[in-house]
Swiss-Prot record:
HAMAP family for this protein: DHQ_synthase
Record field: catalytic activity: 7-phospho-2-dehydro-3-deoxy-D-arabino-heptonate = 3-dehydroquinate + phosphate
Pathway annotation: Metabolic intermediate biosynthesis; chorismate biosynthesis; chorismate from D-erythrose 4-phosphate and phosphoenolpyruvate: step 2/7
Function per UniProt: Catalyzes the conversion of 3-deoxy-D-arabino-heptulosonate 7-phosphate (DAHP) to dehydroquinate (DHQ).
Keywords: Amino-acid biosynthesis, Aromatic amino acid biosynthesis, Cobalt, Cytoplasm, Lyase, Metal-binding, NAD, Nucleotide-binding, Zinc
Pfam families tied to this protein: DHQ_synthase (PF01761), DHQS_C (PF24621)
Enzyme nomenclature, EC number: 4.2.3.4
Chain's gene name: aroB
Record protein name field: 3-dehydroquinate synthase
Family: Belongs to the sugar phosphate cyclases superfamily. Dehydroquinate synthase family.
């Protein structure tokens, strides 16, 4: 299956194909001339897939080097970026060479940031191996690293030259790592794709059901993301819809300590919290929050977080990228499959946290 992100200046394809990881070299050869490629990955994904990807690339005529960093959100920072820069310089990477991100969302975000800033930008490809990365973070060109103040506070827009998704990589994910990706999938059904929501409603929520329907889940999720990105590449309008649950979700990740609450888990909690407050204010229909809770809990996603420190969460929210002056843009779902922006004074955000 293939989708095209038809941006005017940087169009690229998303290829979804089981077993495609072993064909990485042939795929890259269609996109890039023979050159040096730096594979950026973490130590866990590297142990699983580095050899397969590296061998395929070298058989296709590419010279490869590998930069690995410790697995986890705690590594997504400027210290790791500087280590990557040093590695690239020492290995003679030039502007005519390229970077491949092999891994989950942390790897993709960090590798994309490195690619977009090293020598003012070099070629970049995404090979996402987690569900969260396959349905969300590998598409759309957002890169970024965390700071002590906020998640993804330092970042760029850097569209990849292509995205290769092998659903078979999901089989090696731990249960928690697979399930957290469903937070983003549930979001897509809520904000845009009623058919996807109804399909999810029919699944029993087990790991087996997710893996069995992975191709469908990935394709439909990518199609929502693709459509929104093409309409609003730089996040000034409808792309904000993709942030449903993320405003509070990012604050939870930051205040809990990066890596303690996984991204998709935080998104699920954020969607429930925003919906509960919006429903109380008449901005979302009665019963919507209950539907979201039921769907999240079926797949094993959390819907609450403890401790719930309102002051810490609010302080983190003041650094959110959707904050404009003394207001913040919240995404709500006035009806299933339809999102909207609700702009409120920043201080009113306290009410959304206290419900």
């Amino acid at each position: 299956m293939k989708l095209t992100v038809n941006l005017p200046n940087t169009p690229y394809d998303i290829l979804i194909q089981r077993g495609s990881l072993a064909q990485t070299g042939a795929w890259v050869k269609e996109l890039w001339k023979p050159q040096k490629i730096a594979i950026i990955t973490d130590d866990h994904v590297g142990s699983l897939y580095r050899e397969t990807v590296q061998s395929s690339l070298e058989q296709a005529g590419f010279e490869t080097i590998v930069f690995e960093f410790p697995e986890g959100e705690a590594s997504k920072n400027l210290d790791t970026v500087n280590q990557a820069y040093e590695f690239l310089v020492k290995n003679g990477m030039t502007r005519s060479d390229g970077i491949i991100a092999l891994g989950g969302g942390v790897v993709g975000d960090l590798a994309g940031f490195v690619a977009s800033t090293y020598m003012r930008g070099i070629h970049f490809l995404q090979i996402p191996t987690s569900l969260t990365a396959q349905v969300d973070s590998s598409i759309g060109g957002k890169t970024g690293v965390n700071t002590p103040f906020a998640k993804n506070m330092v970042g760029t827009f850097c569209q990849p030259d292509g995205v290769l998704i092998d659903p078979d990589t999901l089989k090696t994910l731990g249960k928690r790592e697979l399930i957290e990706g469903m937070g983003e999938v549930v979001k897509y059904g809520l904000i845009d794709d009623v058919e996807l929501w109804e399909t999810l409603d029919q699944l029993d929520g087990s790991v087996e059901s997710i893996l069995e329907h992975a191709d469908y889940i990935i394709y439909h999720s990518c199609e929502v993301k693709r459509k929104v990105v093409v309409e609003d590449e730089l996040d000034n309008g409808v792309r904000l819809y993709l942030n449903f649950g993320h405003t509070i979700g990012h604050a939870i990740e930051a205040t809990a300590g990066y890596g303690q609450v996984m991204h998709g888990e935080a998104v699920a909690i954020g969607m429930v919290q925003i919906s509960r407050a919006a429903e109380k204010k008449g901005l979302m229909p009665a019963g919507m929050t209950a539907k979201i809770i039921a769907m999240c809990e079926k797949f094993g996603l959390p819907t609450t977080h403890q401790p719930w420190n309102v002051d810490e969460l609010y302080a983190s929210l003041t650094h959110d990228k959707k904050t404009r002056g003394k207001t913040i843009k919240l995404v709500i779902v006035p009806q299933l499959g339809q999102a909207a922006i609700h702009q409120i004074p920043m201080e009113e955000m306290l009410e959304f946290l206290q419900v």
